[in-house]
Amino acid sequence: MKTRQNKDSMSMRSGRKKEAPGPREELRSRGRASPGGVSTSSSDGKAEKSRQTAKKARVEEASTPKVNKQGRSEEISESESEETNAPKKTKTEELPRPQSPSDLDSLDGRSLNDDGSSDPRDIDQDNRSTSPSIYSPGSVENDSDSSSGLSQGPARPYHPPPLFPPSPQPPDSTPRQPEASFEPHPSVTPTGYHAPMEPPTSRMFQAPPGAPPPHPQLYPGGTGGVLSGPPMGPKGGGAASSVGGPNGGKQHPPPTTPISVSSSGASGAPPTKPPTTPVGGGNLPSAPPPANFPHVTPNLPPPPALRPLNNASASPPGLGAQPLPGHLPSPHAMGQGMGGLPPGPEKGPTLAPSPHSLPPASSSAPAPPMRFPYSSSSSSSAAASSSSSSSSSSASPFPASQALPSYPHSFPPPTSLSVSNQPPKYTQPSLPSQAVWSQGPPPPPPYGRLLANSNAHPGPFPPSTGAQSTAHPPVSTHHHHHQQQQQQQQQQQQQQQQHHGNSGPPPPGAFPHPLEGGSSHHAHPYAMSPSLGSLRPYPPGPAHLPPPHSQVSYSQAGPNGPPVSSSSNSSSSTSQGSYPCSHPSPSQGPQGAPYPFPPVPTVTTSSATLSTVIATVASSPAGYKTASPPGPPPYGKRAPSPGAYKTATPPGYKPGSPPSFRTGTPPGYRGTSPPAGPGTFKPGSPTVGPGPLPPAGPSGLPSLPPPPAAPASGPPLSATQIKQEPAEEYETPESPVPPARSPSPPPKVVDVPSHASQSARFNKHLDRGFNSCARSDLYFVPLEGSKLAKKRADLVEKVRREAEQRAREEKEREREREREKEREREKERELERSVKLAQEGRAPVECPSLGPVPHRPPFEPGSAVATVPPYLGPDTPALRTLSEYARPHVMSPGNRNHPFYVPLGAVDPGLLGYNVPALYSSDPAAREREREARERDLRDRLKPGFEVKPSELEPLHGVPGPGLDPFPRHGGLALQPGPPGLHPFPFHPSLGPLERERLALAAGPALRPDMSYAERLAAERQHAERVAALGNDPLARLQMLNVTPHHHQHSHIHSHLHLHQQDAIHAASASVHPLIDPLASGSHLTRIPYPAGTLPNPLLPHPLHENEVLRHQLFAAPYRDLPASLSAPMSAAHQLQAMHAQSAELQRLALEQQQWLHAHHPLHSVPLPAQEDYYSHLKKESDKPL
């Protein structure tokens, strides 16, 4: 989608840049017209929305979008006399539009935005969307409309800017060329009355709207958003519209916050734009919209919004213009003014332009829609979609059609959604729908196309549009007019009716919609206004909008407005508002009720609007359609939209238009409508019933396909189609290409069997009149008994069987898992029990370790492993080391249950920082005493120069006490029952080895569950002493100290330096070898950041005894093996390091040993090879001081 968008964007850009691109131009024109009108609408809406948005979004996205928009907006605005508006709009526009433009520009895809910003883009967007299609020279307007609308849809899809596109129209400047084209359109004015109308409307709106408008328009055009804005501004509604578009976009921005709004308005544009942030410019909203339906938004959806805008704009200009002038002018103008507060005056002018548009308004239908859109837009602007939606309403039909359809595909919602959907889409939960929409959007585009076509084509195809068409000009105008009022209503109802409107594009539908639409629209405007109002004081808006509706809308919108502001705003007010406002706005309960629905309503509005717009568009589009060729195609497209929809979702689509709507509304509508929206949407649906549109609601999904259809439509649209491809982008779906969207009469849902073959019966779902040739409105059902049926049945059966099988397997797995869990729970319970026991006893460690491995033999190293549950595997030195370091103390196992945990604690809480009971002294007092004694000793020792007394030495060792476990861990294994090898690694997981060893060593006594606490303590103490003795052995000591290999390693690596320093130190101090008296010498422990004094090891508070020595020897031997045993737990690196450290230490010790050897204790003298020496030496070191 994005790509397409980009492409389109580019195209658009191109278009913008190029006057030439007929389609583009056309689109542009159309877009412009649309944008002009719509743009204005957009702009106005934008202004309005802008304002609101600006306010809201302003804050949100104001910055960027603001800048962009502002620039553009200002450009336009200023240009236009919308200065006021401009600022606001700027804001608004800024928000959505500028960004859009800029972004768009920036982003190809975002072009949309740009479009919004820039006319070209806008148009381009249209183009983009509908570009191919767009270009229908004759159809320019149509095309433009269609294209624009479509394009807008698509383009818009791309860019909310299309929303802005109307703005883009402003880009008139660029688009101006298109404008030229457009102008031609204007020329075309006669041409299709909507062409002219549109152009006039649009254009007029844009340029015609009065010089200012033109300026504004131009500016708007140039500014695009602004243009829109300004025209909008002038339109008042225009601003709103702009806002609508922009507002949609812009509002979106406000919605940005409320994504909804964004979604809605922006959604249409910005939200959609979000992707097109540019549009978001308004993509602020975009962003939000994205949030809302970023997916959607990013997707085409936004464009649709844009598109709708465009469409709406395009149409709306006429539409808007007319109603505006007629009905709207005041109200709308007001509304618009309201929409663009500043626009008020501007609105006046704009209005004037509107009137200009009005003239086009002849095309009026479009113009009014446009105007309306403006109004709507303005109000709706939020409905950029609104514009679209509103516009849609007014333009809603448009937008719906156009926008919606346009967007439909992407953002059908944007279109209508824009107003209606969009919010839903964005704002709404509908969003999802919308998202679907996103997919759906394509359909919407189709619809949009439809609408657009309707809008654009409507002229030519008004009839095509059927009701839409029917509503057509008069209706359109009326619609718009009504729409405005009604749009409000419509919006409210619209939602329901939207479809209706859509569906019932027929005047009745349309009309009603228009009425409703008008109401709704008005609501939109109001909504928008509200939105805007919300954003900015829109209250006047309401007044100004059709007071009644205005109020309604307003009130709805108003109330909602603010909320809607974002929402409503975004969408149409109603829609958006609908959304929030929606609720109120869409008087429709459903809409109101379902939040999503509100969007739906919005959508509905769109729908209604669409309808209306469509009607209007159709009407107006009639004018527009004048550019019938594309028009029709567009319409066809539009119709196809339904078709597309239908195709996409045959049933859904059926409505075709509705699908479009659906698309447009899908989120709101379809998603909402159909689902939630059913009520709302449903109404729409029914509405849909009236026309393809209604189905749109249902077709929401289908609408998706329409996008493809849209593309298909695109072709039909011809030039428009081309741009329509973006719709295709939206194609997402259901793929019925909405090729013949244009002038074909609105598809009628027939559902009659058309052909039967041996194996299947084909049902014709939609009857598209003379345009049904290539439509894929058929769906076939395999006949029973046929091979196909059989195959399908088999497949189903197979799937069912597989599912059952899977379910069975799953159940078994579940059972297995349950059993597993049970087992684990059992283990845990056991563990807890053992832990409790352990805690009662030697809670600190042994028991815990036991606990962990209650099922294992007491000493089994495994227990340690269990203790260190996450056994990482054989060797994860780095991990282990890391985790070790992460521990409070390297030496101690992290978990309290750990056998060594206490050991660490045992070492000395102070030392280790563990407050665990000492290994041998659980009694805190005892521990305390001991520690004090040790510290005293140490101090004394240190004073004399590290004279370490063996006892002290041992105490230091004590550190190893826990370490001793470690040591044992290494060497102790032998001692232990557990196999040394076993313990090391098993324990080692992290502190495992040392724990294991400790377990094993200490385990002997300590771990053994059978031992009493006292025994265990005694044993442990012995063990500790033993170890400590061993500990004298530097190696052992090292090992012990480094309870864990890595710790050890760490010490080494970490402190080989320390070692050496220690050597120096202890050498200097003639004191203790680091190993021996780690503390004294700044031993490893010291190295390990233990407080020196705290090292005293509780275990060896007293000198070792012979038995300890013996033990020690026992240990010693294992200790010798230590490297091996250590190695198990250690990684190669660890081992190496440990070995290296050891060897270094050993060598140094050996040298030093000699001095101390004589001093060594016998026990230290235990015959150990090097170790013995080492160890003797260590001991000696200790003793030496003695």
UniProtKB/Swiss-Prot annotation:
Compositional bias segments (type: Low complexity): 258-270, 349-365, 375-396, 484-503, 565-582, 618-628
Subunit description: Interacts with NR2E1; the interaction represses the transcriptional activity of NR2E1. Interacts with BAIAP2, WWP1, WWP2, WWP3 and RERE. Interacts (via its N-terminus) with MTG8; the interaction enhances transcriptional repression of MTG8. Interacts with FAT1 (via a C-terminal domain). Interacts with PQBP1.
Residue ranges, compositional bias (Basic and acidic residues): 17-29, 45-63, 107-127, 791-835
Example of a GO cellular component annotation carried by this entry: perinuclear region of cytoplasm
Sequence segments annotated as region (Disordered): 1-604, 618-763, 781-858
Keywords (A to Z) from UniProt: Acetylation, Cell junction, Cytoplasm, Isopeptide bond, Methylation, Nucleus, Phosphoprotein, Transcription, Transcription regulation, Ubl conjugation
Protein's UniProt keywords contain Membrane: no
Biased composition (Pro residues): 157-173, 537-549, 689-714, 735-748
Localization: Nucleus; Cytoplasm, Perinuclear region; Cell junction
Short motif Nuclear localization signal, span: 16-32
Protein name: Atrophin-1
Encoding gene, per UniProt annotation: ATN1
One of the record's GO molecular function terms: transcription corepressor activity
Residues modified to Phosphoserine: S34, S77, S79, S100, S102, S106, S628, S657, S735, S742, S744, S892
Residues spanning the signal sequence: none
Modification type Phosphothreonine: residues: T649, T665
Modified residues (Asymmetric dimethylarginine): R1111
Region annotation (Required for interaction with FAT1) ranges: 875-890
N6-acetyllysine carried by residues: K637
